[in-house]
Every structure is written in C-alpha cells, then in structure tokens.
Amino acid sequence: MRRDSSETKRKILTVCVRLFLEQGYKSTSVSQIVDEAGVARGSYLNLFPTKDKILLELTETMFGGQFGVARSIADSKLPPVYAYAVETAIQLTLTELNENLREIYIEAYSQPDISEYIYLHTTAELKQIFGANFPDATESDFYEMEIGTAGLMRNYMARKCDIHFPMERKLSRFLTAAMRVYKVPEEEQARVLAFIQALDIKAIATEVMVKLFAMLEMKYDFKLSKNGETEEAR
C-alpha cells in the first residue's frame, strides 16, 4: 500500500509541476491533474487536500536549489549583503521573464503555510548576513523583519515592469527599502546598488531559470513543452 501511495504521489507531482510551469498555477484544475496523472480523484485528495499542498512542495524544491549561483557572482571577499542583493535581484527578475513563475511566487508568498516556510527558510540566512548590524537581535527579531521584507518582495514581484517602472527602478526601490530595514549604511547601499546595476541581471536570471527548469524536470521526471519556456530561454 505504501509503495502504491508513493507512486501515486510521484505521478501527481510530476503532472502538477509541469502544468504549473506550462500553463500557470490558477489555470491548473484538479480534474486536469487527475486525468493527466491517471489517478483517482479520491487518491489525489487523500494525498493533497488542496493545491497549495503541492505548491508548498514545489516551493521547497525551488528555494532549495535556485540561488546557488548568487554566491558565485557575489565574490566571497565581498560583504554578505552583496549575495543578498544578487539573490533578491535574481528572484525579482525571474518573475519578469516568466509569467507562470510570477504566479507561482506570488501564490507562495500569499498562502499562509507556504509564506511561513519562506519566513523560516530565510530567517537564519538574514541573521547570518545582517547580524552584525543587530548585535542583540535574536532569530525571532529577524523572523519578524522577514515578514516585512517578504511583503516588499511579494508586492514588487506582483507589479509588472513597464516603460514607467523599468526593471532597474524596481530593483533599486526594493533593495533600498530592504537594506534600510536591515540597517545597511547609506554608503554601503550605494556600492551594492552600483554592483547590481553593473551586472547583466537579465542574462543571469535567464541562466538561473533554465537551470531551475532542468532541475525540476530531472527531480519530477517530466519534459517541458516549448510553450512552457520563455523566449529568453530558447
């Protein structure tokens, strides 16, 4: 029975992740999932009572694997705030490259259980990066600050770039607001922003997206259709 349940879960996840990336989270119905996975609706609901349970699993995979490149871009000799800036700039840019990724991220930051995972996942990293600015702060303090900066991230991801609000402006606004929360000195903020502006962040984010999709294809054993890719990724 356990093997059957494990196989059913694998089939469901394979179909769900592919459909979320190809057509979007909200456009993927339970009926479509069970039809394409070839499983009974009852079996699906036993394993995943709601779609956001699947989204949580996908979010854990994405957050676990998408940002390794940031550490290599931000030289280890630089202060850790540079890695934070690269990571967040990549995430904001990813959502401009692919509307289905935008929807996945916004849903993840909006669902209580998933946003809680994000807060907890990020808190330890924030303490490591910005701890020197808050010598008496606890992990709880950084958790509470992350609730605020995660809200900034969600809202900046949701607002699409246009001629009046280009990507460069979005990155600058988000990073300035976040760095002020974490008490980064103004002079250091200016250096970090100049560093980010000197990067080809769109090319970097495109590379991250291609690697992310490849990792998800391998983990969940599926192949994205060409329609699931952005023009930049082809």
Language model regions located:
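A short secondary-structure junction motif
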Residues: 41, 62-69, 94-98, 102, ...
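Helix-turn-helix
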Residues: 11, 19-53, 57
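Short, hydrophobic secondary-structure boundary micro-motifs
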Residues: 102-107, 187-191
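Hydrophobic alpha-helical connector segments
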Residues: 57, 68-101, 111, 119-123
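Amphipathic alpha-helical packing segments from all-alpha helical-bundle domains
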Residues: 109-161, 165-176
